[in-house]
Design a protein with these regions (language model features):
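Active-site adenylate/phosphate-handling loop in enzymes that bind or generate adenylated species
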Residues: 8-9, 114
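Functionally engaged cysteine thiol sites
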Residues: 10, 20-21, 92-95
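Long, compositionally biased charged/polar accessory segments in the mid-to-C-terminal portions
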Residues: 27-211
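Short acidic, glycine/serine/threonine-rich loops at helix termini
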Residues: 1, 17-20, 57-60
Length: 211
């Protein structure tokens, strides 16, 4: 048939509630800095602005007044929580489609660590990997239209474990959502738990299920 199916490997899908909470936090910070009106929206949001390259990418926000805000991903509270798997959807911690269980013809994924294996193709803008899952006739047509290099499966998985396994649910995920529901600022909720928090977590785990 003519049907060609493609899926992609993702880190996980974050909570919509958390995303909205983060945006509200940034709008609140913006208003506090300017002392002006109430900023209600953004013109543009980029998770990975690569002006400084992939390895030093920024999260970029452009507010309704066209002012731009950029922050290094490792210092941005939202990205810190996302990278540490703090607020992925519950199903993401037990993803049923990793390890090529979707049965698609092709799978796309990030080739993290390519700079250590094939530095000659690393442009610091991001390199993708294409898995050919069957002998679909479309393969030859596709390869004639792209620049590619054959690599080993082990080399790819070494830098991107999402291809074959889900991330563990963080022990303090429940505490994070509890803080958020109590009205803590987003940046304070994202902080790792202190001693009191850890004691409370231990008590709560006795009565609650994990993700």
């Amino acid at each position: 048939g003519n049907l060609v199916t493609v899926d992609f490997v993702c880190h996980g899908v974050p909570s919509q509630k958390v995303w909205q909470s983060y945006l509200n936090y940034e709008l609140k910070m913006k208003q506090g800095q300017t002392g002006e009106g109430e900023f209600k929206s953004f013109k543009k949001i980029s998770f990975r602005n690569k002006t400084n390259g992939w390895k030093k990418y920024n999260i970029e926000l452009i507010f309704s007044d066209s002012q731009r805000y950029m922050q290094y991903f490792a210092e941005n509270p939202y990205m810190i929580g996302f990278i540490n798997n703090l607020y992925l959807r519950p199903s993401c911690y037990h993803c049923a489609f990793r390890s090529f269980r979707s049965h698609s013809n092709f799978t796309l994924a990030d080739f993290w660590g390519v700079e250590n294996i094939h530095p000659e193709i690393d442009d610091d803008k991001g390199v993708s990997v294409l898995f050919v899952n069957d002998n679909n006739a479309y393969v030859e047509k596709l390869l004639n239209r792209i620049s590619y290099k054959k690599v080993s499966f082990d080399d790819v998985v070494l830098g991107n474990r999402s291809i074959v396994s889900s991330y563990d649910c963080p022990q303090y995920r429940h505490l994070f959502f509890k803080k958020l529901s109590l009205g803590f600022d987003f940046n304070l909720s994202i902080l790792k738990p202190n001693l009191f928090d850890r004691v409370m977590m231990k008590i709560e785990r006795t009565f609650q299920n994990k993700c």
